[in-house]
Amino acid sequence: MKKQLYQLSNTDIAFPPIECALDSPDGLLAIGGDLSLARLSNAYNNGIFPWFSEDEPIMWWSPSERGIVELDNFHISKSLRKHLKKHPVTVTINNAFIEVIEACCEQRIDTDGTWITSDMLTAYINAHNAGIAHSVEVWREGELAGGLYGIMQNGVFCGESMFHHQTNCSKLAMWALVNWLKRHNAHFIDCQLENPYLMSLGATVIPRPAFLAKLHAAQNYKVDPAMWIPQELNAIYE
């Protein structure tokens, strides 16, 4: 199948075949369209995600290699366990989604710029209100110390971004997420791109066909949507 860049319609939410994604830049499949809930849901169901900067058109990607976290392979270091014992935290889900995504945006601006544009903020807040985007919050002494957010589709959590205001608190958010997903029969976490930080936590990289096969298999994982009712996660690190 010919590799070429497609221009999406504003009315048709369909995507071209993933096999058409470019080799350079790796995985770029299409531009344009919108960030409507229906299009976002269709994208994630097919292993596609949006990634672009404020001054760029909407760009849709499916890279040739995909970073994932197999839930049973998540790595917890001894130092992280010691840190948690010395500095306990409270973990919640969906209690502060807007604060989490805004903190992710601010942290990226402070480091290397951000792809969380104003349109992305609006789109993911809408997805949260519709029940498909979720957040994990880590609190210490009543302050939001770290967290992450992403999209849950069937048995796959598609991680979008994480942040920390205090040492190790993004790792603690990830650890809590992994344990919570395991409790509820989820399949794996899609990290989208290879990331040294996540690789240190046990993420691996697999080729696109293997990823798509796992994504398809995840449709058979029945996950109770009630797992995302806003709540405190008790004994989540046990």
Swiss-Prot record:
The keyword Iron does not apply. GO terms for biological process: protein catabolic process. It catalyses: N-terminal L-lysyl-[protein] + L-leucyl-tRNA(Leu) = N-terminal L-leucyl-L-lysyl-[protein] + tRNA(Leu) + H(+); N-terminal L-arginyl-[protein] + L-leucyl-tRNA(Leu) = N-terminal L-leucyl-L-arginyl-[protein] + tRNA(Leu) + H(+); L-phenylalanyl-tRNA(Phe) + an N-terminal L-alpha-aminoacyl-[protein] = an N-terminal L-phenylalanyl-L-alpha-aminoacyl-[protein] + tRNA(Phe). GO terms for cellular component: cytoplasm. InterPro entries: Acyl_CoA_acyltransferase, Leu/Phe-tRNA_Trfase, Leu/Phe-tRNA_Trfase_C, Leu/Phe-tRNA_Trfase_N. One of its GO terms (molecular function) is leucyl-tRNA--protein transferase activity. Pfam families: Leu_Phe_trans (PF03588). SUPFAM superfamilies: Acyl-CoA N-acyltransferases (Nat). Keywords: Acyltransferase, Cytoplasm, Transferase. It is found in: Cytoplasm. Its EC number is 2.3.2.6. It comes from the Bacteria. Functions in the N-end rule pathway of protein degradation where it conjugates Leu, Phe and, less efficiently, Met from aminoacyl-tRNAs to the N-termini of proteins containing an N-terminal arginine or lysine. Belongs to the L/F-transferase family. This is Leucyl/phenylalanyl-tRNA--protein transferase. It comes from Pseudoalteromonas translucida (strain TAC 125). The lineage of its organism: Bacteria, Pseudomonadati, Pseudomonadota, Gammaproteobacteria, Alteromonadales.
